[in-house]
Curated annotation (Swiss-Prot):
Cellular component, GO annotation: nuclear envelope; nuclear pore; nucleolus; plasmodesma
Subunit structure as annotated in this protein's UniProt entry: Part of the nuclear pore complex (NPC). The NPC has an eight-fold symmetrical structure comprising a central transport channel and two rings, the cytoplasmic and nuclear rings, to which eight filaments are attached. The cytoplasmic filaments have loose ends, while the nuclear filaments are joined in a distal ring, forming a nuclear basket. NPCs are highly dynamic in configuration and composition, and can be devided in 3 subcomplexes, the NUP62 subcomplex, the NUP107-160 subcomplex and the NUP93 subcomplex, containing approximately 30 different nucleoporin proteins.
GO molecular function: structural constituent of nuclear pore
Xref: InterPro entries: Nucleoporin_int_Nup93/Nic96 (IPR007231)
Keywords: mRNA transport, Nuclear pore complex, Nucleus, Protein transport, Translocation, Transport
GO BP term (any one): mRNA transport
Recorded family membership: Belongs to the nucleoporin interacting component (NIC) family.
Gene from which the chain derives: NUP93A
Phylogenetic classification of the source organism: Eukaryota, Viridiplantae, Streptophyta, Embryophyta, Tracheophyta
Coiled-coil parts of chain: none
Name listed for the protein in its UniProt record: Nuclear pore complex protein NUP93A
Organism: Arabidopsis thaliana
Cellular localisation: Nucleus envelope; Nucleus, Nuclear pore complex
Length: 861
């Protein structure tokens, strides 16, 4: 209905407009226009847009006035609205069908989970990228630091004075880093200079001083304690950062000093390997004594030590602190009618032994009724350094069995655990020890307590733990058993994944695995310079000839193998000084490397076996030759003159005959390596003048050939060789002892030198264009007989010439032919000389002359 009315309205309007159009008279001023509906719509929109533009300023002014009235900056608002963010609506995220609460919550849950997963993925990727970048930067910094340290590890070390090569030069003071050579070097100033350099360079310096003193003492047959001196040198470096670490390098040096026996008397009646274990046990006892004193000082009131300073009083003060929660102790009890005090007999004996107070332990065992049966066993163990008789061990083992059976029936509180440990130590039974470790693993608070117990139990078993059996059929506990048990665990178990890096080598040293400990230290990464410590620990152990005793279980190396490993390490360390030009420190460490394969201290005095002495001499010659080949090496080892009396070589080869033999061999090696200058110098130093001249003639012959082929440096090379030859001949004149045979050889080589010198002058004349003079000199040469006035020579004459002379002949003949081509033949002598040359070549065809020489002869005719 409504549509019909609307249509009728539009019809009436159209009818009215048609009538108006008919009534309108045409005008020339306004021509008629006809538009359809689409055109009218477009024109109306255009008109409306013009109207809106006219109305906009008034509306904008009104809007700005309204915003200002509300305190809003219209310009700021307009700038902010230039950028806007389109956010999704709920209709975009959730479907229209999700109208119930359950479906809505399900959708929210799913969206939250997806968003959480996506955010977690982004966080993981970002964290991974950050971590990888951090690791990459750390690795790069470490690589850069290690590389720079490898380049400059010794660069800041003091350099020796290479000018002073007297016999005492090796014992002189070194100039500290950064100090002037004119300032006297005092220990205080050295420490000040060392304070500003890295720890590994400090160690290298102070240890190097000890090595020089060690070598000097061994050369002179004087006593020296290397481990103690290395430890003292390390102590001068100042405080070491040991926060959170149970073992530092000072502790390891103390252990090395203990196991080598430098701080105690020589142990008789036990093997060298067992003596090392006893030394390790004594080190742990000294450490426990320090622990007791620190505990007493930390708890002075509970210790109640008073004015007593005896060893037994210290042990009782320590027990007052340790057993403070158990009540009154027996040694403090004054009223027997009150509650019975705590019996500490076995505690006192155990801690006296643990601290090394043997006399006090025996006194308590004898004076107490409950331990009187144990007293004779303890006395025997102390007297024999743990090597009790089999009968005593069987008695102690039986007592252990009784206590363990009692514990099985009545509980573990039925016996004193310290009593069980003490009887187990006396028994030395492997079965008892393994049972204690299995059933009573919490007996030991620290690894030091555990290792002290194990070291106290071991027996000196030769050939392995299975070769000796006690009377009751129980096998004794041996050092091999201890090493095998400790080696079950990875190094990271001891070092807490690298947080305490020195614990593992400390455990290896305590269990007399000396070579594995050194090898582990030498490979320990970090800025502590532990590889330097490893080298000097090896020097200390080898000097005492004990390194071969500590190859460890599974590393059954011979004496030579163990010493060779250490020698290689010392040699490699010494070569670092060689690369930096410090020849003084190089020779000190090379001497130690050679002494290491020779058996340590015994090698210096010649008391090692024949094979070790041979190995030492071979390595010493090899290493000294290596120094000779370096720049200033000859001057350093031999001095300004002579064959080593004034240099460092005299330290190692006091016999002049051995020195001469070594230098002749070194000169031969130099010649094989092409180091002719050094070979000539060495031959001259030992008085082998003919050999030196022969080397010069060989080099001069090669230089003349190079010069003839146009080599630029040939002339300077030949001039230097001729000067060197003349210098040798001048020295030869004043040499005191020259044999007749040597004189003849020198004269022969001098003749060859003059012949080569003449050939060189002919080449120079030819280059300068003095062809006639060159031909005259050629005619004078022996063995060729090219003078036209002389008869032809036979082939045998040329064969008797020096090979160095023969080498120069082809180039010489080419020069002669060139000169002949440039000199006019006025009397036929030129043609005669050409014929002589052709005849010479024909009579020596077996020489295989160069093809171009034959061609040049053919062209000349």
């Amino acid at each position: 209905m409504a549509n019909d009315q609307e249509m009728s309205g539009w019809t009436d309007l159209l009818h009215s407009s048609s009538k108006l159009l008919e009534q309108a008279a045409p005008s020339s001023q306004f021509p008629p226009l006809q538009r359809n509906l689409d055109q009218l719509e477009a024109l109306s929109k255009k008109l409306k847009a013009k109207t809106l533009r006219n109305e906009a300023p008034s509306q904008s002014i009104a809007a700005t006035r309204l915003l200002a009235r509300e305190g809003i900056n219209a310009e700021q608002l307009a700038r902010d609205l230039k950028s806007f963010e389109l956010k999704t609506t709920f209709e975009d995220v959730f479907p229209a069908e999700a109208t119930s609460v359950e479906e809505y919550l399900q959708q929210v849950h799913e969206m939250a989970m997806v968003s959480a997963i996506q955010e977690a993925q982004k966080d993981n990727v970002r964290s991974f990228n950050d971590y990888m970048m951090k690791v990459l930067e750390e690795d790069w910094r470490k690589e850069k630091r290690d590389f720079l340290q490898s380049l400059s590890r010794i660069s800041m070390l003091p350099k020796t004075n290479m000018i002073d090569t007297s016999r005492e030069a090796h014992a002189g003071q070194l100039v500290p880093v950064g100090s002037s050579p004119r300032v006297s070097s005092t220990p205080g100033k050295e420490l000040v200079a060392l304070a500003n350099i890295p720890i590994h360079e400090k160690k290298a310096y102070v240890y190097g001083e000890v090595v020089k003193k060690l070598n000097t003492s061994r050369e002179r047959g004087m006593p020296f304690r290397p481990a103690m001196c290395f430890k003292d040198a390390y102590d001068t470096l100042g405080a070491e950062v040991t926060r959170g670490k149970s073992v530092n390098m000072q502790k390891i040096w103390q252990l090395v000093q203990a196991i080598t026996g430098e701080d105690s008397a020589v142990r008789q009646g036990v093997s060298k390997r067992m003596a090392l274990a006893i030394g390790a046990r004594h080190h742990l006892q000294h450490g426990h004594e320090k622990f007791i004193m620190d505990t007493i000082q930390t708890h002075p009131t509970q210790a109640a030590l008073g004015g007593s300073v005896g060893n037994l009083q210290r042990i009782r003060a320590f027990l007052r602190i340790r057993l403070r929660d158990y009540g009154v102790l027996d040694f403090d009890s004054t009223d027997a009618r009150r509650q019975p005090p705590v019996d500490t007999t076995w505690q006192q004996i155990y801690f006296c032994l643990r601290t090394g107070y043997y006399e006090e332990a025996r006194e308590i065992a004898r004076s107490t009724r409950s331990s009187q049966q144990f007293a004779p066993l303890l006395t025997e163990w102390i007297t024999t350094d743990g090597m009790v008789a089999a009968e005593s061990a069987a008695i102690a083992s039986e007592e252990c069995e009784k206590m363990l059976r009692m514990g099985d029936r009545l509980g573990r509180t039925a016996y004193d655990k310290k009593k069980l440990l003490l009887y187990t130590i006396i028994s030395g039974s492997r079965r008892q020890i393994e049972r204690i470790l299995r059933d009573l693993s919490t007996l030991f608070n620290t690894i030091e307590d555990f290792l002290w117990f194990k070291l106290s139990c071991i027996r000196d078993v030769t050939g392995g733990s299975s070769s000796v059996v006690l009377n009751d059929g129980l096998a004794p506990y041996s050092l091999d058993d201890l090493q095998a048990y400790l080696n079950k665990f990875e190094p990271s178990y001891y070092t807490k994944n690298g947080k305490d890096p020195l614990v593992y080598p400390y455990v290896l040293l305590l269990s007399v695995q000396l070579l594995p400990a050194i090898m582990h230290l030498s490979k320990e990464a970090g800025d502590g310079g532990y590889n330097i410590d490893a080298v000097h620990i090896a020097i200390s152990l080898v000097d005492h000839s004990v390194l071969s005793e500590g190859s460890g279980t599974g590393h059954k190396l011979s004496v030579m193998d163990s010493n060779a490993e250490a020698s290689s390490m010392i040699r490699q360390y010494g070569s670092m000084f060689l690369h930096h030009g410090d020849l003084q420190m190089t020779v000190e460490y090379y001497a130690q490397a050679a002494a290491t394969v020779g058996g340590g201290q015994l090698a210096w005095s010649g008391r090692s076996n024949v094979d070790q002495q041979r190995q030492r001499n071979l390595m010493l010659k090899q290493l000294l030759t290596e120094i000779l080949l370096r720049e200033r090496g000859i001057y350093f080892l031999l001095g300004a003159r002579g064959s080593g009396e004034e240099g460092q070589l005299g330290r190692f080869f006091p016999d002049s005959r051995l020195r001469q033999q070594f230098l002749v061999e070194a000169a031969h090696q130099c010649q094989e390596a092409g180091l002719y200058d050094k070979s000539i110098e060495l031959q001259k130093r030992v008085g082998a003048f003919s050999a030196a001249l022969e080397t010069i003639n060989k080099c001069l012959s090669e230089a003349i050939c190079s010069l003839a082929r146009g080599r630029l440096d040939g002339e300077s090379r030949t001039s230097g060789l001729i000067l060197a030859g003349n210098d040798i001949l001048e020295t030869y004149k004043y040499y005191p002892e020259v044999s007749l045979q040597e004189r003849e050889r020198v004269m022969e080589q001098e003749t060859i030198l003059r012949e080569l010198e003449a050939i060189l002058s002919i080449h120079k004349l030819g280059r300068l264009g003095n062809h006639l003079d060159a031909l005259r000199e050629i005619a004078k040469l022996p063995f060729l007989h090219l003078d036209p006035r002389m008869p032809d020579a036979t082939a045998d004459v040329f064969q008797s010439a020096s090979p160095y002379f023969q080498t120069c002949v082809p180039d010489l003949l080419k020069v002669a032919l060139t000169c002949l081509d440039n000199v006019p033949d006025t009397d036929g002598s030129i043609r005669a000389m050409r014929s002589k040359i052709a005849g010479f070549l024909a009579s020596n065809t077996h020489r295989n002359w160069p093809r171009d020489l034959y061609e040049k002869v053919a062209r000349s005719f």
